């Protein structure tokens, strides 16, 4: 299973990490932290204003790493020989790598090694084939984009070249789909201002609409058509007829 990098804290102080947190973030964005990987080793705080909490990107990452590590059996976690490999984008600089290591330390992971994501991808492929080769790895995640050329020789993988964009990923595709497909439909059918993104009143609406857009985008990976489904009862807006 995939564990999204998301944190959600409800008004009672209960903390959720992963899929439940990500899904709840659409309905209550001020209770959630998402996309903090982009902010690693920056001075940008992550604010959960609904619960009056401010976290650093490293603290957010530590919460996710702690949750993932907790999936292991207790005897494995407590074994001194147990180590953890964390994959990071090829475009991560040394400061971002140091921040990732700091998050791992805060999460109590113990022995940790970092591996560039293209290298990990090639190693995964090589487990299923015997021949060495040169690979072009195109890695687009939720927040980052990397393109790399890697070579496998005798089971060892070397990264020959790489390039990337720290602020380009699936979430940016969501934004483009929203701006060009969903937003025009919302403006045509509901009583909304043109600059709704600048109005805090519509923050939850925007998050719900973006969440629905993402779901449709994922469907398009396997289908030629997808429906963006927006539950009107949760949008909290009136249509053009006033209903």
Predicted regions and their residues:
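Oxyanion-binding/catalytic loops of NTP- or PPi-dependent enzymes
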Residues: 1-39, 53-54, 74-243
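Transmembrane alpha-helix boundary signature
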Residues: 46-48, 72-76
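Adenine-nucleotide phosphate-binding core of ATP-dependent small-molecule kinases
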Residues: 49-70, 241-243
């Amino acid at each position: 299973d995939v564990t999204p990098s998301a944190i959600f804290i409800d008004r009672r102080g209960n903390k959720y990490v992963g899929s439940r947190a990500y899904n709840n973030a659409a309905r209550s964005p001020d209770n959630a932290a998402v996309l903090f990987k982009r902010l690693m080793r920056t001075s940008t705080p992550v604010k959960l204003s609904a619960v009056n909490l401010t976290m650093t990107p490293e603290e957010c990452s530590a919460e996710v790493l702690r949750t993932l590590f907790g999936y292991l059996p207790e005897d494995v976690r407590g074994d001194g020989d147990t180590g953890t490999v964390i994959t990071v984008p090829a475009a991560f600089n040394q400061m971002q790598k140091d921040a990732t290591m700091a998050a791992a330390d805060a999460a109590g992971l113990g022995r940790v090694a970092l591996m560039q994501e293209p290298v990990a991808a090639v190693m995964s492929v090589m487990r299923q084939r015997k021949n060495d080769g040169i690979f072009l790895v195109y890695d687009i995640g939720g927040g980052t984009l990397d393109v790399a050329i890697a070579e496998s020789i005798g089971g060892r993988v070397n990264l020959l070249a790489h390039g990337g964009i720290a602020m380009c990923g699936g979430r940016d595709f969501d934004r483009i789909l929203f701006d060009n497909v969903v937003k025009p439909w919302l403006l045509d059918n509901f009583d909304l201002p043109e600059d709704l993104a600048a109005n805090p009143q519509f923050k939850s609406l925007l998050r719900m609409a973006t969440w629905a857009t993402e779901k449709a985008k994922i469907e398009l990976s396997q289908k030629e058509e997808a429906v963006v489904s927006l539950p009107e009862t949760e949008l909290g807006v009136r249509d053009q007829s006033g209903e």
